Structures are given as structure tokens and as C-alpha cells.
């Protein structure tokens, strides 16, 4: 490395007197190797150790490359690893004892030495001059380590050179293994045997002679089997060889047997054996290793002393160096004495007088070297440094991570809604401390447990348990706060709603304010939530699918909604890993922070149970306990878990960001990870091995010793398998028997599920919050899961392992010597495991106090009710915490909380004063109005003139606010640079208040302090919209307006003052302020003689005037006016401005300004007291203006009045006086008495902070946005974030109640058969199909015969079908109207034909030739398919006859509810029978008539009178106007139409699907020509109307309709004479010149197109009209109300009729309810129209109805966004405006008119 580069010119005569020897030993340390590597790992995270981190990364990379090149049998011996440091872990002990032990230990030694070396030199650096002479040496693999140091020219090269050495060490170990295995194969079943022994024989020659004697005879012993002496020293030798041969040696040789010997830890094979290895061995190792290019080009810079010769290697490059060293390791004998002699010679040669030895652990060789050096040098001149000890000391407690991926993560906020009434973490902790089990019976708001419970498990879809752990009132929600309408809130999953609420509360606790700091930038915040079930969507929402079904129910909208509300632009993830979802989501959030994707995460888990299916399914899977208990974790009778609700949210940041942001840290995440139990016996079964592996992995990532963990929160569900497996994993990792915990280091374990049950997707979040509370409370709560005896499967040696299950509340205090560490386990039923390592939060000490005595405190809310609640909560908090710091409270309420529009603000100096003001606000809360409803007010700055301040000021802002002080100092530097004296003595308090400064200093101090004060207001976000300056204050005003620069301002003020001093006589003139109007002064001084002449200097108000003049004149006029009763006050000024005293300077001053100053166009209006007007242009303010302003009158009255006339200012303008005292604000209040707010920046005799705080409180109350963080920034390190009470929600219940027990049946036939018995829900009226089938008949339309009675020619058959059955639904889907699948009359026809064909042979067996005629079909109500395909939609058709031959069959169609309710018929028909041959004969005469009309139409086409349509054109027009047919229905190939007459060429599809008697698409294809004419002909007004058919007189087919066959259809529709909008016609179907079918008297009726949606809309899940069970009013869709909205009061929509009644549709019936919306009479005046039938009144009622709002909420200033009218609802309302009000608007309506008032005015203007 560069710091060690030897001086090339140094020799024996060098002045250097020091030699440094770096000795790399060949032994790993005897103490805890894992601890050394763990500390190096921790150091590598520090930004101060980049080279160490890179070396570890590079070494890991090369090892992975080398391992991938190994043979499969060797490669599989090495487990997967993330970093080479893992090889040192106890878990990898078998690796170090295995077949590859030599390679593994060699790598570990090199990595430890080089990593320690790098770390050491990143901590300390040598003085280059002291380290000119360096010698490197080592033993064994240590010698290889030295090569990296020798070759690296600079420190930055060492990681790459070191990685290459790691590669060679590994390859060397593998090579030696391969050779040694040939010498003697290892017994892998036992422990490895040593290949080398240290033998205490001093005479190495005698030892060699003994060996020669034993192995000298080549015939009796193979050369490769002989024992060699691999190392010699003065007192001993090392004998090496195959282990069995070594044992034989000690048995056979008396010399060796009698000598003391020790087996060395050399298990990898034989080295230092020239008889085994040749030069090619070393060369092959080096050549096979892919050396880094950088290393390959390096040359050795430091000498490495050979352990055989004692001389430095003679190598010219890296390859030669490596070959020399490896060859020596393989072939050469170690002669340590030679090394010692070589270093002695180096000392003698260099003349060194001192030696320093760096080493990596004590050894005999090191001792020999030390003794030798001390024999040459003076003992005191030899020093030894253990680099290993120095570099591996514990790292600093808090490191600075070198990247985000190495940061610790801080949890800074949390909030919850948990069972047992735990609506906050305090209540949660109370449950834990008291050891409560909060399980209870399933509450009624979820489902009726009485009907859904079966302890036997025999009844389908029922739960075998009645119990769970539930949140109280999960429907409570503050919808307006989150900008949600009641409709949206009701439809939104409570999991999402409560996630929003707890996210807000967690962020509130975290002191979050968006964009306050770098880590809170909105673009850098992400949301991560775990959710594993959709109960509310599946059951509650699913009963009435509405606009918000998708955004209110789909999981992605949960975190997405949080991002949207808070305007986070980072990622949002909804994560499902079953029971580990919550903690897995937090782990993903951690990864986002570590990967630098985000800077703040809001994460957690949610679970609200409303679906009984979940209980039933888990019971059937044997997951759940049946008892009235939460989870019986570790109990001998544990039989499953208890389900639980829960919502938990946390806010997480990187630790360094949290500390920089002054956050309260609840706990620190050191590591987190997730894996999968891949080798478990089943997917739901846990696996101890994988759990333990994950624990070790996460601990490694965190740099934590498992024995340092003192608490583990287990998953602990209370299942036999899960508890046992998890306990095994815990014991193996945290409380092993092999490396036991000390007596003072116990491990405690617990499981929160014993208290709260298993929250499934929120379980891990709950467990994490528990541990955070334990950190805070310094206690471990009792475990209550063991109800009786502990599970016998759990090992009995827990006490022996020092592992404890706390049965009582136990202390867990902070320790001074180490931090408390905890682990949270969370496992998923799908096999996922998540583990997190936590550390207690650091203690923050505040040494300095905030110097401010007065502080701004505010309480705010979005509504008045919440404001009252927030004030009350704060008062209660202060009563409970009397020592609360006002400074901290101000910081928390102003800089660290959201500021809402309903607010109160105050600036108390004492806690007593604060509580008094808070109580006063509660008493007058009705006087409080929301701030900023119409936007922030206009702000005006007014700048004070001279004479208002003390002669010497002492500004607290200058002392306390660095930015203010810096700005003043910059201005002062400019002033001094322009030749003026420093003005700081006039403001810093260094002189008494009455100390008189020069005019230059005084005037510069005033103007510069005003500029600095303005800059301070700017820094707080308060910028003026208009400015005005009084006299000298005009200069500061012009600067702030951008007219002149700060430099020019200082120049003009300073030069003018200098001119005054130079050219005007001090004391010759004076000024007086008179409490009189200008007119009064003139009247009372009109007789004054000429010697008493004076000038009107300032007109400050109606009765405030300032006069200037000579001293005598002012004395005289003052006397006169005082005698007249007017108060006169002489001003303490050096010169009389605005008088003739200034005349001598005017010309020169103007010339100077013209020559030196640049005037710019103002950036804001400037109110000019000189001109009495508002200046906007860039020409008025110039050199002449400042000349005139010096001499002429200041007319404040005219200036303000004219500004008001121009609307530049108004009574709502907020005035801030920028100056040393409140002067101008008093003028403004007198001139403009309607002004609401005029505030000072400073007061002459008051503390700066009191004045500023009072003004800020008033500004805040008025709605001015203030950068509160900037206000507190100079003092933030002295302030704490308080954990104040959470927001007081204005909650109401929004809930869709699950009704009935349809989850039990779901329309499945098996329920009726399998569920029969006691308590079965099945009955004879069940809508089940299969349960009651009495026939084998099954077609696509007639799916099940549920009743059949045949008696001669009399009979009844009842069929039942499910419209959702695929074939039937597809048939309906092929006939779409108004984007709904509608059952076409051809489907009814197929049903009729099928029943006729089924019954005829049963009732009249001899009627084989007869075919059916469907007569008098009348459909009174269309059958429209549900949108929800998952719910059955049943209908039945009954066919009855008393005499089939003479009376035919009577058919009725009826809808059937899922509970078996049968409705009134919606269609009827009659079937008769006839002979088709007779039909053909009777139709024959009509053929020529029909054919002639077809020919006539063809002719009309030819002359352009009639229209011809292609297939595509016809069906495209049909779809546009009414019916969108699917492909198989589109049989018309071409159409000719003229008026109401037309014919079509038809070809039926040849693609068959379904089981039909007469396929509906065939019937439609040949018959819907009539419908085409009625909805596409130019003879019909199809724009405003549409036509539908209620049926026909008769339909019959003499021949079957054949797939692929061609036909012709003809029809002429005739309007009826009564002008009722009814049309009749006969459709003829022809084939090959014959009429083969006919639809007689097909009828169409005309209806307004506006009613299309009303009559063709998908119904709810059960179509309800008047039923045959009982006579009840037809229920209709209820109007939702603001408060508790439930499905009970909102039945599904009626199935709309296909044929509307002739009279107008009846209005919707509104249900009677005690909490219905307020009537119009109760609405505010703004919503009351003189005529309630006006468009605007109707529009407001429509909006209120659609959003489920009360009319009283629709006040003029209410914003649609605040009311929850989002883009989706906007589209719905806009569409209803068009349909119901004929108001044509777009979806952007509520963006164009954002408030109720805006919309109402627009409607009244255009639609009145």
C-alpha cells in the first residue's frame, strides 16, 4: 500500500531508525471466531470502512465463482451463503469439520487477517516517515495473506488483491484435498484426523535419521506414504503425513513415542512435501485462478521473507509471487530460525534502532521472533501490536451507514384498533399487563352465529366454533375527514377505513408533516399493508354491488387509498402471505428503505372478520380451537387458534433520518427477512429447520449474536404442530445447549395471541407493536396461553437453557452495558416465515433549553365537534402531565402536526395561562369559524419609519436565530464595504437603550433590521402581496418589492444620512406629532406669524399629523396647538425630515442615486404615501422619487384609501408591520377601521419572541400558511416531540349488514341433500336444482324438473333453471340491451317448445305427428341477468293442462329468490298442437303474395327508394339503437327495408353449442327482422324512442330450423289505429320458396329512450315483487342515510320490467327510518330555493341522495372534494343530471364548480 511504499533510495545509511515487521500467523484465534467476524461485519456497514466492505464483497464473489466450478459432489458440501463471513458461524461448524475443512479454514484465516488489516488501517494511519522499512513474513496460509499487502500499491488496491489471495487459498485447499485423498481417504463419518504433529525433539537431524531408518527402504514402504519433517525450530519439529501413518510412527519409533507431541489443527491434507508435490502443482493453482487484472499487473513492493530460506522472494510480478509462496507451502520445509536470522540481517543492514511487530495473535513463533529482536535491539525499542485485537474491538454504538442498505431502521409511530376495546396502544398494553383473554362470541354485527354454528361439523358451511376476538364497532369512521361521502364510506371495506385512520394516528404520533424534511418528501413515502381476506367485499358489499364495489373492496385500494389521501407518490403495496401478511408487508417496507426506493414507510396489517365462510373453512381444515378462549399457546390441550380482528399501522424511517428529523424512536429494526418452509410435510405445516435458518440469516444481517437477544415474541398460534416446531427453532438458535446462556442473560419468550387471538394478516403487526410497548414500559407481560399444563412435546430442559416463559409481569429494564434486543416471529399458513430483529430506542438527552419564553400553541380539526374534542383531550393531557414543556408543546402542535381549518391558536407564557385560554375557547367555541375556507387572505407588509425604536436595540432574533443573524451580518458587511460604519452595535444590545449613535448607524440599523425581519417572515412562508413604507421605511418596502437591491438600499440610506450629517445643522429643526387632523391644525394655526412656519411632514391618520420645521417654529406651533387642547409629542430625531432642513442635500442626493442605483419594476404593488396611490410600473420609483420622499409630505391616508378603492387591499387584508414598534398598524386601524388584523413584528419594550408569537398565533388563526418547522428549526435540538392524544374523530357508523343465511346455501344443490337433518336450512322450498329433480330432462333452458304430476291427459310440470348456468347465461349475454344481458323472447320460446315436447308424449302418447304452437305469449317484465355471476338467479316455469288435446298447455314464468320465495308471474303463454303438414298446405297460397312483396322491395332498392343493409351494417345499427347481438345471433346476411316493411336473407350459424329444442339464436335470427325495422327504420323516431316486444299471437315452425341452412324473412309492421304506440306484424320464414314458419301478430310498443336504463338494468341478487308467500309492499332500493347504513334498510333493486306499464312509472318508495336525512325545511338558507322544483333544488337533492348526504350538509362553502364526491361519483351524478334533470354536463362538472355555491349559482344562471 502507498503508506508502506519503501523509499527506493534508502540503504544502510538511511536516516530511518525503525523497522516494521508484519507477521501473518497460521492459526485462527482460539476465542470466539464468530464474534470477530460479526464485528468486522458491523464495521463494514460504516461509511468510514469502504475498503473493508469492498474486500468482503469481492472475497464473497470470487468464492462463489470458485464453488460454481467445483464438481457437484464437492459443491453440494457448501451451503448457500450471502457472505464469506457466514462460514465462521456456529451453524457452519460442520463445514469446518467436513471434507473441505482445509479450504474453508484457509479462506477464513486469509479473510480474517486481511479484513482486520484493512479495518485497522482505516481506523489508524501510520506516519510515512516512520515506516520506511517494512518486512513481511508469515507461516502457512498466513504467508499467502502477506502477498496481498506486498502487491497492493495503494490502499484501494488491497480489496482486489486480497480477493485474489482468498481465491488462491481456496484453490490451494481444494488441490491439497484432492492429492491427500489419494494418499489416505478420509473417514467422513468421524471427526477429521490431523496430518501434522508438533514433536518436542530439538535435534532435527536425529529425527530425520529416525525417519530415514523407518522409511528408507523403498521396497518395504512407498515413497508417498512416508512421514516428513515439515517444519523445524530450535526446540521442536513438525512431523507430517497421512494420519494413520503418523499414528503408526508413534507406535513404532521409540524416539517419537517418548517425545512430547501435540496434534496440530491441520485437517485438510499434506503440505510442505516435496516428495508429493512438484513445481507444476503451484503453477496449476495460480494459472487456474482467474486473477484480477489489477492484481496481475502489480509488482511486489514490500519484501516477503521465505519461511524456508529466510530471504525475501525474488519475484517480478504477482504471478511469480503467488507461485513462490504456494510452492513453498506445498514443497518447502519451514525453518523459522532462518526467518529470524533474515530479519536480524535486515536490522543490521538498515541500521534500525527500533522494531515494531504487527501480528494477528500470539504464538510460539511470534515469541521466538520477539526474543530475537530484543536480543539485537534494546528491549524498550521492540513493540508488538495485535491488529486482530485493535481492529475487532466492538464498533461504536452508532455507526454511520455507508449506504441505505446498511441503515438501521427506526419505528417512529404506531396506532392500532385491536380486540378487547384496544383502540390505542395504551389500552393494548393494559390488556397485556392484566393478562386478559378477550375472546368472545361472534358479535351480531358480523353474522348470526346461532344460524351459522354447528358443533358437530356435519352441516355444510357452518362453523364449529362460536368464538373469536373482535374489534368493537368496526364500522365507526369519520367519513368527511377523509373526504368520503357516506355512500362511499358505507361501501368501503372497514379494513381500508381503519387502515386510513390508524395510518393517520401513527403519522400523527410520528410528528409527520408532508415535505417537512428530506425523508418526508411526498414522492419518497410508500405504503405497505398485509391483507389476507376480503370478507366485507365477499359478503357485505356483495349483497348490493354499487359504484364503489371495486374501489371499496379490492385489496389494492387499501394502501392505494392511503397514498391518495396523504398524496404520497411512492409505491403502495397490498401483500398477502396468509397469516404473515402484516409482518411480511413491513419487511417489504424495510427492503424499500434499505434499497433506497423510499425514505419513509407506512406499513401494517389489517383483518376484519365478517364472512362466516372463513370460520367454516378453517374449522373444516382443523385450524381453529372450539373453546371460549384465545390461543392456548404452549398448553397441553392446545387445539387450534382463535380468529381475531386487528388493524395496525406503523411509520418507519432509516435511523439516521429519524434522528435528523428529531423523531421519537419507539424501536429499531436491525434486520428482517422472509423465507419459505419448503421442506415441510405439507404446505400448511411449519418447519423448524427453515425457521431457524431464517433466524440465523436475519441475525447475521443485523450483526447480532443470538445469545444477546433477551426476548423472542413467537408466532405461537396454539396449534400442536406449530408450537412444537417453532419452539425447536427458537431453542436451536437462541438457547442452545452447546453454547449456553450465562446465568445473568436469560431468554424470555411470549405470544400475544394468547391475549388477542390470531389476527391472521395483522398478527405479526400486533406482535411487533407488543414488543415496542415492552421496550417503552421496560416490562415483559405475563403469558396466559398455558391454561393448565405445558405442552409435553416441548423440551423439559428450558430452565437448563435459561429460557423462561413469564407467568407474571417481569421487569425488562434498560442496561448500561448493552442494549435490549428482541426478535419477532410471524409465520404464514401458506409456508412463509418472517422474522425481525429489534433493538431498543436510543436515549436522547437535551442539554440546552429553548430561550423563548412565549410559545405559539394551536389546536385544530376538520370539524367543530372534533375541535372541541381535541381541546378537551389536550386539557386532560396537560392535567395528567403538569410538567409538560410549553416549548415542546408548541413544537409538537405547530411544527409536527397537520393544521386543519377549524383552529384556535394562542401564545401563552405559562402553563396556567395556556389552560385558561383553552378553557375559554371551549366556552366560546360557537364564535370560532374555520380559517382559510375561501383561500388564504391577502398579506400586506408595512415598514416603520424613524423614531419608533430605542436609540440602541437589543434584538432577541439576532441572538437566537442564526439565519436572522447571518442576514444582518451580510448586510453589515455590505455596509462596511461601502465605507459606512458597522450598524450592529445599534441592534445587538452592546450599548444601553438610550445610547445615541450617529445618523448613519441609526438609519442603517433601522432599514437593515427591517429587511432582515422581512426576510425572516419570508423564511416562515409569509410573503406580502403588497407593501407600503412610512418615510425611511419606504426604502425597505422598495427592496422587498424588488425595486432596489439590498446593496442599493444600504447605499442610498447610508449616503443620505452622511449628506444630512455633512450639510445639515444638528438640532436646528425638529418634528412634532399632533393628535389632530390636518384641517384642525390649519384652523388653529392660521393666525401664526411667519416666524412660526412649519411643514406638514406626515398625515398618519384622521387625527394624527406630524409637523416639521425649525426648532422655534415647532416650539411655537406646539404651544399654540396644546393651548387649543391638542396633544403634541416631540419626536426624538436628529433631523427633521420632510422639511426645508433637507433642502441642501436634495440635488446631490438625487445625482448620486441617478449615477449609482438601479431601479426595477416592482414584483408586487407598492402603495406610495408620497403619491397617495398604488405603483405598479417600473418608472415611477426612481431617483427623483426618493428625493421627493425625503422632502415632501407622507400622506398615509390618501395612499391607503386609494389602495382600497383599487381593491389592492381590503378589510380582509392581513397587515404585518415590519419594524421596531407597532406604529403603522395603529395608523392603519384608524384609517381603515374595518381592518380585521394588523400585527406588529416587534414592540419597543417587549420581548421579541412574545410579539412574534402573538402575531404568529393571530396569523395562524386567520388562515395564513406558516412554515412552522422553519420557526422552530433553530431550537429543534432543544425540543422534544410530545406523544399527545390522537385526533378526536367525529365518528359515525357506516356498515352494510350481512343479512340472512345465504352463505350457508349459495344455491348449491348438495346443501339440500348433505345438510338434511336437525337444524338443516334446507327445505322443500329450497331453490336447489339437483336436490328436488324428479326427471332426467336437462337442457340449457330447462335445467331441472322439480315437480311432475301426470294423470291421463291432465298434468302439471314445474321446471326450474338458473340464469347464471353457462349455456343459458351465454344465450342471454348474446342479446344485450343497455349493456345488460336480457333474456330474449326466443329463449322463452325454446322453454315452451321443450316443455311441450316433454309433456305431449306423456299425456298423449299417440301424437307423434303433432308440433307445438306457442300462442299468446305476453312478457310483462323483462328477465335481466345479474352482473354478479357468482350468485344464482333462479326462475321457474309451470306448465299445466286439464286436457292437452283440447285445451293445450298453460305456461307461467316466475322469478324465485334464493330463499325459495316465488314471485308473481312475469310472463304467460299457451301451447296448442297441430299437424305441420296441414300448416304447410294452408300457407302455400300466401307464398306468391310474400314473394311479390320481396320483389317489390328489390325494385325499390334499385331505384334508390328502399335501403339495403349488409350484415355488418344491420347489426351495427341494431346495436347502436337498442340490441347488441352476439355472433351466433347474427343470422341476417342482408336486409332490405322501406318504411315499416322489409325482408332479410338469413343464414343460421353451423356452430353448435348448448342443448336446445329450438335454439334461441335460430329463432331470433329468422324473426328479429321485426325488431330491426322497429328500431332502425327512418319511419320511426329512434333517437328519442325505442321499441320492444311483449310477445306474439302465435309462433310455429312446420320444419325444424337447421344449422347452416338459408332462409328468408319478411314482415310489414302496421301501427295501430288508437295511436297507442303499438305496432303489429306477421313474420314469414321461407326456405326454398316455401313458408316453413310464421310468427303471427308479433307486437312492438314504443317507449321514450330516457326510460331505457330504468327498464333494462340488472337487478339485485334477489328479484322481489309481490310474492305468493304473503302480501307485502314491493320493496325498492332504499335511500341511504348519513348514520348507520345497513343492508337491512337497503333491499336490492327490483328487477326492471321488459315491458313497462302504460302509465308513468311510479315514484320510488322511500323507507321510513328514524334517522332519515333532514327535510328541506331544515336545510340552510343556501340550499332553500324559493321554488323547491327549481333545477338547482332538484340537483342538490339528487346529489344528497346519491352520496347519502344530509341536505343540511350542502352549504354554499362546502367543497365537493370535502363531501367525498370523487371522480367516480361525479360521473354517476353527471349521468343522472342528464337523465333526470335534462342538464347535460361532463364528468369534470365538480372540478369546474368546486363548491355547492358555485354549482348552485351556475344552475340558477343557466337553468332558471
UniProtKB/Swiss-Prot annotation:
Residues 1375-1650 are annotated as: Product template (PT) domain. The modification O-(pantetheine 4'-phosphoryl)serine is found at residue 1767. It comes from the Eukaryota. This is Non-reducing polyketide synthase CPUR_05437. Its EC number is 2.3.1.-. PANTHER family: FATTY ACID SYNTHASE, SI:DKEY-61P9.11. Residues 1506-1653 are annotated as: C-terminal hotdog fold. Non-reducing polyketide synthase; part of the ergochrome gene cluster responsible for the typical purple-black color of the ergot sclerotia. The ergochrome gene cluster produces several ergot pigments including the yellow ergochrome secalonic acid and its derivatives, as well as the red anthraquinones endocrocin and clavorubin. The pathway begins with the synthesis of atrochrysone thioester by the polyketide synthase (PKS) CPUR_05437. The atrochrysone carboxyl ACP thioesterase CPUR_05436 then breaks the thioester bond and releases the atrochrysone carboxylic acid from CPUR_05437. Residues 1659-1676, 1713-1727 have a biased composition (Low complexity). Pathway: Pigment biosynthesis. Residues 1343-1494 are annotated as: N-terminal hotdog fold. Residues 31-272 are annotated as: N-terminal acylcarrier protein transacylase domain (SAT). Residues 406-840 form the Ketosynthase family 3 (KS3) domain. The active site is at 579 (for beta-ketoacyl synthase activity), 715 (for beta-ketoacyl synthase activity), 758 (for beta-ketoacyl synthase activity), 1375 (proton acceptor), 1564 (proton donor). It comes from Claviceps purpurea (strain 20.1). It catalyses: holo-[ACP] + 8 malonyl-CoA + 8 H(+) = atrochrysone carboxyl-[ACP] + 8 CO2 + 8 CoA + 2 H2O. Residues 1659-1727 are annotated as: Disordered. Disruption phenotype: Leads to the loss of ergot sclerotia pigmentation via blocking the production of red pigments endocrocin and clavorubin, and of the yellow secalonic acids. Does not affect the ability to infect plants. SMART domains: PKS_AT, PKS_KS.
